[in-house]
């Protein structure tokens, strides 16, 4: 269970339920990043996280058999899975152990798997398997619509991700030893093409401000070289993966997010909980649902920026509009303060106490 949005949600759910239920966590790989209550029963299927995509695909039936053995041994009648490969394994294993399958899709498959052979294989598997699940949980309205329209998934509900707002607030007050020289933007996310950190770096090169980037990933080396190439090492810092990113959020002045596509970007809620004004691309899906909940969820910006109730939305892959939004946030203190005042109000809509009841009705009650 590495660092990531889905993994964080699993940790929140289990830690919240362990006082009421006997909780079991079955991992494909033995890695655990998030803190889990010691009372949670953890087992893993002993898979190698460094396997190639091809090997992971070929081993799906074998891993499904391993899961079915655990299910039969523990006499589980229902298994909940998070993330695409785990969903495949859950559904395939149910043919052997006959348990009910609840799968959770955390991204928009038609966009996430839109390239190459790997994308075609995953689209095929989603179309072939997902509709056979007892229930599919999407974490945004955009994801739900994508699964309905493009993958013929019928038994489907949408439940947003839960957040422990009090814990985030508490962690945000922890001391960190980092120097802040001027107006500072911050972004958090895996260093991959989808998060499009280069767009933020390109935007900030002509702005009198600093940028903190929290996260790790395959593009770390490329981004380090790109920052040096643009001679921005004095204003752009790659801070790596942080166990407590909230203390960095609380020190920054504005959160900026440049993803090309998302499922439900947890970092936007976390930034709201830290009372940060937000600039985000209007990617599918999640940012509009979070920052502009009263607008048409099917609309997507093309040529303009949009000042919403809870932040600024900009078109995807548009460096000029992103730079305009960043300059506006620096120059307009009244606008920044207005977003800050509204942020915690919006974050509270995703409180764990509220969202967990929706999960509990589906997962914990027969």
Predicted regions and their residues:
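Donor nucleotide-sugar binding/catalytic pocket of nucleotide-sugar-dependent glycosyltransferases
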Residues: 43, 127, 131-170
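A conserved mid-protein helix/loop that constitutes part of the nucleotide-sugar donor-binding site
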Residues: 7-12, 183, 187-206, 218-224
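Nucleotide-sugar donor phosphate/pyrophosphate-binding loop at the beta->alpha transition
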Residues: 58-63, 100, 109-132
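N-terminal strand-loop element at the rim of the active site
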Residues: 1-4, 8-59, 143-150, 158
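Conserved acidic donor-binding segment of nucleotide-sugar-dependent glycosyltransferases
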Residues: 292-319, 329-333
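A short, well-ordered alpha-helix in the C-terminal region of glycosyltransferases
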Residues: 328, 335-349
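Aromatic "clamp/platform" in nucleotide-sugar-dependent glycosyltransferases that forms part
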Residues: 241, 260
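Short His-centered aromatic/hydrophobic patch
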Residues: 81-87, 105
């Amino acid at each position: 269970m590495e660092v990531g949005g889905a993994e964080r949600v699993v940790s929140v759910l289990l830690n919240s339920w362990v006082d009421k239920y006997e909780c079991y966590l079955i991992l494909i790989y033995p890695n655990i990043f998030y803190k889990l209550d010691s009372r949670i029963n953890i087992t893993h299927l002993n898979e190698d996280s460094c396997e190639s995509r091809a090997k992971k695909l070929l081993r799906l039936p074998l891993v499904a058999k391993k899961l079915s053995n655990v299910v039969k041994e523990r006499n589980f009648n229902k298994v909940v899975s998070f993330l695409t490969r785990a969903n495949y394994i859950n559904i395939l294993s149910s043919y052997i152990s006959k348990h009910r399958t609840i799968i959770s899709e955390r991204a928009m498959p038609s966009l996430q798997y839109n390239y190459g052979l790997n994308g075609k294989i995953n689209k095929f598997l989603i179309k072939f398997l997902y509709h056979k699940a007892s229930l599919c949980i999407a974490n945004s309205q955009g994801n739900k619509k994508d699964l309905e329209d493009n993958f013929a998934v019928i038994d489907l509900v949408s439940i947003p991700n839960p957040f422990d707002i009090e814990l985030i607030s508490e962690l945000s007050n922890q001391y960190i030893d980092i120097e802040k020289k001027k107006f500072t933007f911050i972004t958090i996310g895996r260093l991959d093409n989808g998060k499009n950190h280069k767009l933020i770096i390109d935007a900030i090169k002509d702005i009198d401000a600093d940028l903190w980037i929290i996260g790790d990933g395959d593009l770390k080396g490329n981004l380090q070289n790109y920052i040096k190439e643009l001679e921005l090492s004095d204003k752009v810092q790659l801070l790596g993966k942080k166990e407590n990113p909230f203390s960095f959020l609380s020190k920054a002045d504005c959160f900026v997010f440049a993803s090309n596509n998302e499922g439900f970007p947890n970092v936007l809620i976390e930034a709201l909980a830290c009372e940060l004004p937000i600039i985000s691309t209007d990617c599918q899906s999640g940012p509009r649902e979070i920052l502009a909940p009263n607008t048409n969820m099917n609309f997507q910006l093309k040529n303009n920026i949009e000042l919403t109730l809870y932040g600024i939305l900009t078109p995807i892959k548009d460096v000029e509009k992103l730079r305009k939004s960043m300059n506006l946030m620096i120059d307009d203190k009244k606008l920044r303060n207005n977003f800050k005042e509204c942020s915690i109000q919006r974050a509270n809509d995703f409180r764990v106490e509220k969202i967990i009841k929706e999960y509990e009705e589906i997962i914990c009650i027969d």
